[in-house]
């Protein structure tokens, strides 16, 4: 019998909002390539993620992983905080 390999989608981004209760908004940057001209350009997408302990703050670099749908817009949860935000930048 084959064992199921659990590979969940993992993304890294910057926390842009932590105002909601147990929810953060993470901006994830990706580089895409134009099919005709082959020029690379940056694309930013925002994802709502579940932060159970409310430990992430604005400006933190975090890793989020896919999970079952938690609400209408939340399909990710916070896995770990890779780098804390600097005091003067991002936090108010």
From Swiss-Prot:
Record CDD domains: Ribosomal_uS17
GO biological process terms, semicolon-separated: translation
Single GO MF descriptor: structural constituent of ribosome
NCBIfam families, A to Z: PRK05610.1 (NF004123), uS17_bact (TIGR03635)
Free-text function comment from the UniProt entry: One of the primary rRNA binding proteins, it binds specifically to the 5'-end of 16S ribosomal RNA.
Family: Belongs to the universal ribosomal protein uS17 family.
Protein name: Small ribosomal subunit protein uS17
Provenance organism: Mycoplasma mobile (strain ATCC 43663 / 163K / NCTC 11711)
